[in-house]
A protein has these predicted regions:
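N-terminal active-site segment of His-dependent metallophosphoesterases
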Residues: 1-67, 73
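His/Asp/Glu-rich metal-coordinating catalytic cores
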Residues: 55-201
Length: 202
Protein backbone atom coordinates (compact mmCIF):
# COMPACT_ATOMS: atom_id res chain seq x y z
CA UNK A 1 0.00 0.00 0.00
CA UNK A 2 1.25 3.46 -0.89
CA UNK A 3 0.95 6.54 1.27
CA UNK A 4 -0.92 9.12 -0.75
CA UNK A 5 -0.86 12.85 -0.26
CA UNK A 6 -1.94 15.59 -2.61
CA UNK A 7 0.82 18.14 -3.22
CA UNK A 8 0.23 21.48 -4.94
CA UNK A 9 3.59 22.34 -6.53
CA UNK A 10 4.29 26.00 -7.33
CA UNK A 11 7.52 27.71 -8.40
CA UNK A 12 8.90 30.77 -10.15
CA UNK A 13 6.24 33.24 -9.02
CA UNK A 14 8.68 36.15 -9.62
CA UNK A 15 6.84 38.93 -7.80
CA UNK A 16 8.22 42.19 -9.15
CA UNK A 17 8.67 45.41 -7.22
CA UNK A 18 5.89 47.38 -8.94
CA UNK A 19 5.00 45.84 -12.30
CA UNK A 20 2.03 43.52 -12.87
CA UNK A 21 0.63 43.75 -9.32
CA UNK A 22 -2.97 43.95 -10.54
CA UNK A 23 -2.35 40.86 -12.67
CA UNK A 24 -0.75 39.04 -9.72
CA UNK A 25 -3.82 39.74 -7.57
CA UNK A 26 -6.17 38.40 -10.23
CA UNK A 27 -4.11 35.25 -10.79
CA UNK A 28 -3.61 34.68 -7.05
CA UNK A 29 -7.37 34.95 -6.46
CA UNK A 30 -8.00 32.28 -9.12
CA UNK A 31 -5.20 30.15 -7.65
CA UNK A 32 -6.72 30.33 -4.14
CA UNK A 33 -10.10 29.29 -5.54
CA UNK A 34 -8.59 26.31 -7.39
CA UNK A 35 -6.53 25.23 -4.37
CA UNK A 36 -9.57 25.46 -2.09
CA UNK A 37 -11.42 23.25 -4.57
CA UNK A 38 -8.55 20.73 -4.90
CA UNK A 39 -7.84 20.60 -1.13
CA UNK A 40 -4.12 19.70 -1.24
CA UNK A 41 -2.55 18.21 1.87
CA UNK A 42 0.44 20.47 1.39
CA UNK A 43 1.40 23.37 -0.89
CA UNK A 44 5.06 23.59 -1.89
CA UNK A 45 6.57 26.76 -3.39
CA UNK A 46 9.94 25.69 -4.79
CA UNK A 47 11.85 28.94 -5.20
CA UNK A 48 11.77 32.36 -6.82
CA UNK A 49 8.99 34.16 -5.00
CA UNK A 50 10.98 37.33 -5.67
CA UNK A 51 12.20 38.60 -9.01
CA UNK A 52 14.83 41.24 -8.20
CA UNK A 53 16.86 39.48 -5.46
CA UNK A 54 18.09 42.36 -3.29
CA UNK A 55 16.65 45.69 -4.51
CA UNK A 56 13.15 45.19 -3.10
CA UNK A 57 10.19 47.54 -2.66
CA UNK A 58 7.57 47.80 0.10
CA UNK A 59 5.04 46.75 -2.54
CA UNK A 60 6.95 43.50 -3.09
CA UNK A 61 6.90 42.72 0.64
CA UNK A 62 3.17 43.47 0.83
CA UNK A 63 2.34 41.32 -2.21
CA UNK A 64 4.52 38.41 -1.11
CA UNK A 65 3.22 38.47 2.48
CA UNK A 66 -0.39 38.45 1.29
CA UNK A 67 0.37 35.63 -1.17
CA UNK A 68 1.95 33.40 1.48
CA UNK A 69 -0.79 34.19 4.01
CA UNK A 70 -3.40 33.28 1.38
CA UNK A 71 -1.71 29.94 0.73
CA UNK A 72 -1.35 29.27 4.46
CA UNK A 73 -5.09 29.85 4.92
CA UNK A 74 -5.73 26.96 2.53
CA UNK A 75 -3.18 24.35 3.59
CA UNK A 76 0.23 23.77 5.13
CA UNK A 77 2.62 25.71 2.89
CA UNK A 78 6.31 24.89 2.54
CA UNK A 79 8.58 27.44 0.86
CA UNK A 80 12.13 26.99 -0.42
CA UNK A 81 14.51 29.58 -1.84
CA UNK A 82 15.45 30.07 -5.48
CA UNK A 83 18.24 31.99 -7.16
CA UNK A 84 16.06 35.12 -7.42
CA UNK A 85 15.27 35.09 -3.68
CA UNK A 86 18.79 36.15 -2.71
CA UNK A 87 22.27 36.81 -3.98
CA UNK A 88 24.21 33.55 -4.36
CA UNK A 89 27.47 35.53 -4.25
CA UNK A 90 26.71 36.92 -0.79
CA UNK A 91 24.84 34.10 0.94
CA UNK A 92 25.66 35.58 4.36
CA UNK A 93 23.19 38.41 3.56
CA UNK A 94 19.46 38.16 4.22
CA UNK A 95 17.23 36.75 1.48
CA UNK A 96 13.94 38.22 0.20
CA UNK A 97 11.66 35.64 1.84
CA UNK A 98 12.86 35.01 5.42
CA UNK A 99 11.75 38.40 6.87
CA UNK A 100 8.26 37.89 5.42
CA UNK A 101 7.83 34.38 6.82
CA UNK A 102 9.18 35.49 10.21
CA UNK A 103 6.83 38.50 10.31
CA UNK A 104 3.82 36.37 9.33
CA UNK A 105 4.59 34.05 12.26
CA UNK A 106 2.10 31.55 10.81
CA UNK A 107 2.65 27.89 11.75
CA UNK A 108 1.05 26.96 8.42
CA UNK A 109 3.79 28.76 6.43
CA UNK A 110 7.20 27.11 6.78
CA UNK A 111 10.42 28.26 5.11
CA UNK A 112 13.05 25.59 4.48
CA UNK A 113 16.10 27.82 4.14
CA UNK A 114 18.79 25.23 4.82
CA UNK A 115 19.32 21.84 3.25
CA UNK A 116 17.91 18.94 5.23
CA UNK A 117 15.03 16.56 5.70
CA UNK A 118 11.53 17.71 6.58
CA UNK A 119 9.36 14.73 7.60
CA UNK A 120 5.64 14.87 6.92
CA UNK A 121 3.21 12.26 8.15
CA UNK A 122 2.72 8.72 6.83
CA UNK A 123 6.39 8.08 6.06
CA UNK A 124 6.82 10.92 3.58
CA UNK A 125 9.93 13.12 3.76
CA UNK A 126 10.79 16.30 1.86
CA UNK A 127 14.54 16.56 1.33
CA UNK A 128 15.40 20.22 0.72
CA UNK A 129 18.44 20.67 -1.51
CA UNK A 130 18.99 24.40 -0.95
CA UNK A 131 21.06 26.25 -3.53
CA UNK A 132 22.13 28.49 -0.62
CA UNK A 133 23.39 25.49 1.39
CA UNK A 134 24.88 23.03 -1.12
CA UNK A 135 27.56 21.84 1.33
CA UNK A 136 24.84 20.19 3.43
CA UNK A 137 22.96 18.34 0.67
CA UNK A 138 22.33 14.80 1.79
CA UNK A 139 20.93 11.58 0.47
CA UNK A 140 17.74 10.29 2.13
CA UNK A 141 18.55 8.84 5.55
CA UNK A 142 15.74 6.27 5.27
CA UNK A 143 15.26 4.89 1.74
CA UNK A 144 12.20 2.93 2.94
CA UNK A 145 10.28 6.20 3.25
CA UNK A 146 8.89 8.17 0.34
CA UNK A 147 11.61 10.79 -0.18
CA UNK A 148 10.78 13.82 -2.32
CA UNK A 149 13.61 16.23 -3.12
CA UNK A 150 12.80 19.96 -3.20
CA UNK A 151 15.23 21.73 -5.50
CA UNK A 152 15.30 24.97 -7.49
CA UNK A 153 17.41 24.37 -10.56
CA UNK A 154 17.90 22.07 -13.50
CA UNK A 155 17.58 18.30 -13.09
CA UNK A 156 20.60 16.38 -14.38
CA UNK A 157 19.83 14.19 -17.37
CA UNK A 158 16.62 16.00 -18.37
CA UNK A 159 15.87 18.17 -21.38
CA UNK A 160 14.16 21.52 -21.71
CA UNK A 161 11.03 21.78 -23.83
CA UNK A 162 13.33 22.97 -26.66
CA UNK A 163 15.44 19.80 -26.41
CA UNK A 164 18.48 21.29 -24.65
CA UNK A 165 20.03 18.95 -22.04
CA UNK A 166 20.53 19.90 -18.40
CA UNK A 167 24.09 18.90 -17.58
CA UNK A 168 24.19 19.47 -13.83
CA UNK A 169 21.94 19.83 -10.84
CA UNK A 170 19.71 17.55 -8.80
CA UNK A 171 20.10 13.85 -9.47
CA UNK A 172 16.62 12.29 -9.57
CA UNK A 173 17.11 8.57 -10.06
CA UNK A 174 13.42 7.68 -10.01
CA UNK A 175 11.79 6.91 -13.34
CA UNK A 176 9.07 9.52 -13.72
CA UNK A 177 6.45 7.59 -15.63
CA UNK A 178 3.62 9.77 -16.85
CA UNK A 179 5.60 13.00 -16.80
CA UNK A 180 7.10 15.27 -19.36
CA UNK A 181 9.77 17.94 -18.95
CA UNK A 182 8.55 21.48 -19.54
CA UNK A 183 10.19 24.87 -19.10
CA UNK A 184 8.90 25.52 -15.57
CA UNK A 185 9.54 22.07 -14.15
CA UNK A 186 7.88 18.71 -14.31
CA UNK A 187 4.30 18.37 -15.54
CA UNK A 188 2.35 15.41 -14.18
CA UNK A 189 -0.02 13.87 -16.72
CA UNK A 190 -1.44 11.27 -14.35
CA UNK A 191 -1.12 10.32 -10.67
CA UNK A 192 2.40 9.24 -9.84
CA UNK A 193 3.28 6.58 -7.28
CA UNK A 194 6.83 7.19 -6.10
CA UNK A 195 8.98 4.33 -4.82
CA UNK A 196 12.38 6.02 -5.20
CA UNK A 197 13.55 9.60 -4.60
CA UNK A 198 11.69 12.18 -6.66
CA UNK A 199 12.91 15.69 -7.37
CA UNK A 200 10.39 18.55 -7.50
CA UNK A 201 12.11 21.16 -9.60
CA UNK A 202 11.50 24.89 -9.41
Amino acid sequence: AYNMIKVAHLADIHIRNLKFHNEYRQVFTRLYEKLAEEKPDVIVVVGDLAHTKTQLSPEYFDMCANFLAGLGNISKTIVTLGNHDGNLRTIHRQDAVTPIVEALDDPNVVLLKKSGEYPLENGIVFNNLSIFDEDNWLDPTDPEKINIALYHGSVSGCQTDAGWPHLSGCQANSPLTGTQQVKGGIRYNKPLLVKKPLCLEG
